Amino acid sequence: MVKKIRIKKKIAVDELTDALAVAQSAVFTDYRGINTSELTTIRVKLREAGVGYRVLKNTLARRAADNTDHSNIKGAFEGPVAMAYSSNDVVAPARVLMDYISSSKSNLKVTGGYLSNKLISVEEVAELAKLPSREVLISKILAGMQSPITGLAMVLNGPARGLAIVLQARIKQLEG
């Protein structure tokens, strides 16, 4: 019996180690006062955004953190902790959780986060949630880069367009 428990714990540590190894960002939450249906709703919203969510056993989470480059996050594992993490969009865990908390008046509390190999405060998580997604930022950059090119094309086409208008007017004048 003890051996089965040890094997299950090792599997849990290995899975969490893998999750921490690929996570670019994470948000830690205190889930006290959250019922199962609300927790399921949170997981669904996070999954739709490509974000993983795990309820953690603190001792196993500390062991998993020791197995990765993120051993400095062990301080976040106190009390009932769940972790939302993403390997793709750095902003997604913070944005989805903060939107959910503000829209549902949930008892879920953000206790901190992890970004760029350091722990961040609740205030920094809130600021991170306000940032636009990666796709929006890329489109803004591309629009900014495209704007001068479009202007240049309009300027270069201006004389040709003007010549075409003058020629069209001359043709009408000769016909009529």
Swiss-Prot record:
Question: What GO molecular-function term can you cite, just one?
Answer: large ribosomal subunit rRNA binding
Looking up Gene3D superfamilies in the UniProt record yields:
3.30.70.1730, 6.10.250.290
What keywords tag this UniProt record?
Answer: Ribonucleoprotein, Ribosomal protein, RNA-binding, rRNA-binding
Tell me one Pfam family matched here: Ribosomal_L10
Q: Subunit composition?
A: Part of the ribosomal stalk of the 50S ribosomal subunit. The N-terminus interacts with L11 and the large rRNA to form the base of the stalk. The C-terminus forms an elongated spine to which L12 dimers bind in a sequential fashion forming a multimeric L10(L12)X complex.
Spell out the family assignment given in the record's similarity comment.
Belongs to the universal ribosomal protein uL10 family.
State the protein's purpose: Forms part of the ribosomal stalk, playing a central role in the interaction of the ribosome with GTP-bound translation factors.
Q: What HAMAP family does this protein's entry cite?
A: Ribosomal_uL10
Q: Which PANTHER family match?
A: 39S RIBOSOMAL PROTEIN L10, MITOCHONDRIAL
What is the protein name stated in its UniProt record?
Large ribosomal subunit protein uL10
